[in-house]
Structures are given as structure tokens and as C-alpha cells.
């Protein structure tokens, strides 16, 4: 919700109703009445996972980021975001939208584009594949070819994600709009089976499309 150059600990000191969460990315949750405002510190460049990672970065052998609390400035933070359309900042002082990665152009074109090397970005956080599906389904956007290409072959990376986090992402996929489109895209890119293996086996042995029709119309 909010991005700032203040560190999480500094935000925590400013607000009484604040708690710090997250191991991968340290965040501050500030409660205002019934609302929770998420405050994130600008991220800096963490390296490429080979010999460029510095203190505060922890990865698995496959490249998935376990912990990354390297802080930086707003432009560095933009390049650390996942998709260009998700890297737009509204400056509350000057009332302007800041765009460092071409997000406005992609938003107007209805394009989902990853920032950086797509395969590496999916490996850093496989949940980005599900986020890509959710944005495309909910917004009716299409994929940039480079962003789309790895989706067919990296579904196995979802096995590395904790069940609780996958459950949360699945709820977002099917309960925030575009559920049928999300279902179709998950199957098209061979991701559905990694989330629902038993259902996938059923769908692969359907007779006259009955199981698929039941799911879509339910």
C-alpha cells in the first residue's frame, strides 16, 4: 500500500498500532480503525544469486529467495518489483505517478510483463507465476512473450512453496474475480496439476468433458 525510505523498525516506532511481519521481506502493518495499511521499505539491488548477493540475502540452490532485506531508493525498488504494471508509484507531495520501468505503457496496452529475466524472476519466487495468471485473468491482459515462455516448464517450482502461502494465493486466484479465466489459464500453462493433482488426473480422463463442465459451471 505504501512504500517509503524509512526502515521497518523506524515505522514501528512511529505508530502505536504497528507490527512487523515477514521473513523473506520485512514489512510493517499499521492498523487504522478496521483497515491495515502495509508499509514496505524501498528495496535495493540484491545481486544475481551467483556471486553478487550481499548480506541480508538468502537463497535456495534453485535460486528461490528465502530472505532479502537489502534496502535502497525508489528507483531501485521499482526494478525489484515483479511486473511493470505493479511498479507504479504515486507521489503524494507532487501528485504525480512515477514510472521507472514502462508500467504505464504496458497498462495502456493491457500487457503483463516481468521486470528482468523472466525465468530468473520465477525461480526467485515461483508464486509470481500464479500472480501473473491472476492479473491476466482478472484484468483481461495478455502476456508479454518473454514473460509467458517459462510458464509452461516451471510449474514444478511451486512444490517449493509452503502450503499456507499457496493456499492464500489460490484464494486470490478464485475469489477476486476472473475465476473461470484463471482456471483455464492454469490448465493451459500446466500449472493446475501442481496445485490440484487429484483434480488434474480426473480432468485428464474426462468423458464428454463432464468434469471440466462441472467445475466451470459450479
Language-model regions, residue ranges each:
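Catalytic cores of the polymerase beta-like nucleotidyltransferase superfamily
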Residues: 1-218
